[in-house]
Amino acid sequence: MKRTALLHAELSQVIAALGHGDMLVIGDAGLPIPDGPRRIDLALTPGIPRVADVLKVVLSEMQVERALIAREAIGQLPVGQLPAWCEGQLAALPETVSHEELKRLSARAKAVIRTGECTPYANIVLYAGVTF
């Protein structure tokens, strides 16, 4: 059995196979998933699992070079403040794009992870970095 936090075999394999610059998307329950990327559906019921929980575990396994979230997720938050579902989890502030652009970009992802999150715009694109 693995010693690290990520026990989901399919997700572990996807992360291990990522190359530099490859995209992995963690999405809320309503994010449309295009036909191209691998679909990893973790949604059990509304709110379970949360994006924050999945993001925490993914970040324990994946070297992330940069991240993107939808501008709409920030809404009226003060400058520099992030939505609760990603607050304190990323090494650097994520870039922002429109929700429509994030959906377009997700078509190029290696995989899209669907969570049970029901918070609007709780979606994040992670770009794989290198460990050297």
Curated annotation (Swiss-Prot):
The EC designation for this entry is 5.4.99.62
Q: Does the keyword Cytoplasm apply?
A: yes
Which residues does the record give as substrate binding sites?
28, 99, 121-123
Pathway this chain belongs to: Carbohydrate metabolism; D-ribose degradation; D-ribose 5-phosphate from beta-D-ribopyranose: step 1/2
Q: Which GO terms describe its molecular function?
A: D-ribose pyranase activity; intramolecular lyase activity; monosaccharide binding
Q: Alphabetically, which GO biological process terms does the record hold?
A: D-ribose catabolic process
Q: Which UniProt keywords apply?
A: Carbohydrate metabolism, Cytoplasm, Isomerase
Q: What PANTHER family does the record tag this protein with?
A: D-RIBOSE PYRANASE
Family named by the database record: Belongs to the RbsD / FucU family. RbsD subfamily.
Name the NCBIfam families on file.
PRK11797.1
From the Swiss-Prot or TrEMBL record, give the protein name.
D-ribose pyranase
Q: Which taxonomic lineage does the organism of this UniProt entry have?
A: Bacteria, Pseudomonadati, Pseudomonadota, Betaproteobacteria, Burkholderiales
Q: Which gene encodes it?
A: rbsD
